[in-house]
Design a protein with these regions (language model features):
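Residues in flexible loops and secondary-structure boundaries
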Residues: 34, 41, 64-66, 107, ...
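The feature represents the first ordered module of a protein
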Residues: 2-91
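Acidic, proline/glycine-rich low-complexity IDRs
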Residues: 116-143
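Amphipathic protein-protein interaction modules
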Residues: 66-122
Length: 143
């Protein structure tokens, strides 16, 4: 099985965001997440038609999966006071914004959240690629 290195940030963006008129693809040779939109759409789609086995379309996940990941992550936080803040953030309107805001004040936990989310998203993708002999390694980004 060969290993494909994929940017955590790029994969999360592709799998969690719904940008009208944009479709995201994973290049299964390079690990690059390739957006097809507006000005580059024809060029990217021509490349995909030429090498269809090289590209995998990345469909955004259902919104509920993001909420479920937040609930699961909050349970893993060892500091009771932060766990309580996160649990409060995931009830009521604006859960995604409130959850992110609470974590941004805790850089170490925010980084752990990014990796946790990446692993959740990659889990679905791993299953799709295993049949082709491809394993995914998430590469953390420095931001």
């Amino acid at each position: 099985m060969r290993t494909l290195r994929v940017s955590t940030r790029d994969l999360l963006f592709a799998m969690e965001n719904r940008v009208p008129g944009t479709t995201q693809y994973l290049n299964t040779e390079t690990g690059e997440v390739v957006p097809a939109f507006g000005f580059n759409r024809d060029q990217i789609l021509a490349e995909i038609r030429q090498y269809p086995k090289r590209y995998l379309r990345l469909a955004p996940q259902a919104g509920r999966s993001g909420y479920t990941a937040m609930v699961e992550f909050a349970r893993t936080v060892s500091r009771p006071e932060l766990r309580a803040v996160l649990e409060a953030a995931i009830s009521g309107p604006g859960v995604y914004r409130r959850f992110r805001t609470a974590l941004r004040e805790e850089p170490r936990e925010f980084k752990r959240w990014q990796q946790f989310r990446g692993e959740k998203v990659a889990g679905h993708l791993r299953k799709r690629l295993e049949a082709d002999g491809i394993a995914i390694e998430l590469v953390p980004d420095n931001d």
